[in-house]
């Protein structure tokens, strides 16, 4: 029987996260304090994040950052996650390509987001923080943060983008099961939310708006810090457990990827799967292609500008050097709520600028077609966000079929779609074009 899954034991969970900034040929430009226009300091960021995350955010020298023992113990509840050979998908496509996926959907909340939520909640508890706030789109990050906060004895408040709050009611229920206070954004509970609703009463929400509300609440609440699930360097750092495991598992499979693909919203799962492999491109040892698959309706990488911009709509965050559509950009109401963000993380933006990362945009219909194909071939219903990575992998595999090329493709299945079936209903009914 052909080997389908490549598994690592719990003692193979990485001991350290990989900090790609230490190896980048060109370092990212600094984030700026919006008041002084000077590079932000750990002290600046510590007003927003816990201090350890602020230090990790600005660390451009240490290649390896040790994972605390207690976080590794929590990782062991679901890590190491499987690397899977997608024989069924290969057969369905009639491609000579070998397709692998790293299955992050097996985590307790169904996605990769827990990898950083556990780390951020742990550091907050260690520093005496009692409350955390965050934003969430589809609810994957909100669910992860709610779960992690409960584990580490913190109170969590989550602002969920209104359209996703309405489209995905069971994610709200999951967050509430873990004890979080969940509020649709924009709301009347913050100045940022009130300002937006005054201008646009029917505003359906965006991640940029939800970030503004979460940041504002954190600033107003004693003993509270803001946490987030993507974009920032420390978040992507925590996600590198994905690629570090995948590197060992690909070795077990006796192959090395020619192309690695991740869906792209802010960059956390994309960086998580690609960065550990990318260091070998920096040295010239490998020539792997890295493809970021973003929604065509929110094309910050393929159509955005590289410039300084705020990470949120109200302008509460530092100024970030990134590919952006503008912090006031209002994305359309696609079902991949976790990808509806106007900008890209600073590290990925620099890597795009320097030619190490390619970007493709995927129409919503194509993403769901690929998601259904994958589900029928592999038995896993993917999250709408993950469907974008699958669609990009399908494109690559079809090129291999046309050229009769045998290539090895790896993508990150960032989450399952079992709480997203209303979106699939819309697709199956022919309502997604």
Locate predicted features.
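Active-site-proximal loop->helix
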Residues: 141-204, 300-310, 421-429
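A short, small-residue-rich loop immediately preceding and capping a beta-strand
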Residues: 116, 124-163, 256-269, 290, ...
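Active-site nucleophile and cofactor-binding loops and adjacent substrate-binding regions
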Residues: 103-114, 132-141, 232-235, 261-266, ...
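Claisen-condensing/thiolase-fold acyl-transfer catalytic domains that form or cleave C-C bonds
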Residues: 264-272, 364-430
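Active-site/ligand-binding loops adjacent to catalytic centers
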Residues: 66, 196-234, 242, 254, ...
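Alpha-helix C-terminal capping segments
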Residues: 119-129, 143-155, 176-177, 274-284, ...
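Positively charged, low-complexity intrinsically disordered leader regions
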Residues: 2-129
């Amino acid at each position: 029987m052909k080997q389908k899954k490549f598994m690592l034991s719990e003692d193979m969970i990485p001991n350290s996260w990989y900090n790609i900034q230490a190896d980048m040929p060109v370092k990212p430009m600094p984030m700026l304090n919006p008041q002084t226009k000077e590079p932000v300091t750990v002290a600046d960021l510590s007003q927003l994040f816990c201090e350890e995350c602020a230090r990790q955010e600005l660390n451009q020298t240490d290649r390896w950052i040790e994972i605390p023992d207690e976080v590794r113990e929590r990782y062991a509840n679901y890590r190491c996650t499987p690397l899977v050979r997608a024989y069924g998908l290969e057969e369905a496509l009639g491609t000579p390509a070998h397709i692998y996926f790293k299955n992050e959907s097996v985590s307790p909340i169904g996605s990769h987001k827990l990898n950083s939520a556990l780390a951020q909640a742990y550091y907050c508890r260690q520093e005496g923080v009692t409350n955390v706030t965050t934003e969430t789109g589809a609810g994957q990050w909100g669910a992860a943060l709610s779960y992690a906060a409960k584990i580490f004895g913190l109170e969590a408040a989550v602002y969920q983008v209104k359209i996703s709050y309405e489209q995905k009611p069971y994610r709200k229920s999951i967050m509430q099961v873990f004890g979080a206070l969940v509020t649709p954004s924009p709301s009347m509970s913050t100045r940022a939310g009130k300002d937006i609703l005054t201008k646009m009463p029917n505003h359906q929400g965006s991640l940029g708006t939800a970030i503004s509300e979460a940041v504002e609440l954190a600033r107003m609440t004693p003993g509270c810090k803001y946490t987030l699930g993507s974009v920032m360097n420390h978040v992507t750092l925590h996600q590198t457990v994905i690629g570090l495991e995948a590197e060992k598992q690909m070795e077990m499979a006796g192959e090395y990827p020619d192309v690695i693909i991740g869906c792209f919203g802010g960059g956390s799962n994309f960086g998580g799967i690609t960065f550990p492999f990318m260091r070998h491109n920096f040295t010239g040892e490998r020539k792997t292609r890295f493809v970021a698959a973003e929604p065509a309706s929110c094309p910050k990488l393929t159509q955005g500008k590289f410039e300084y911009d705020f990470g949120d709509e109200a302008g509460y965050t530092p100024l970030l050097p990134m590919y952006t559509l503008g912090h006031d950009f209002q994305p359309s109401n696609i079902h991949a709520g976790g990808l509806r963000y106007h900008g890209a993380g600073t590290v990925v933006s620099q890597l795009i600028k320097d030619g190490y990362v390619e970007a493709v945009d995927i129409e919503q219909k194509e993403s769901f077609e690929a998601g259904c194909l994958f589900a029928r071939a592999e038995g896993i219903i993917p999250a709408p966000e993950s469907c974008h990575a699958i669609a990009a992998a399908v494109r690559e595999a079809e090129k291999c079929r046309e050229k009769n090329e045998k290539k090895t493709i790896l993508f990150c299945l960032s989450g399952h779609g079992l709480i997203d079936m209303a979106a699939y209903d819309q697709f199956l009914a022919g309502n997604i074009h």
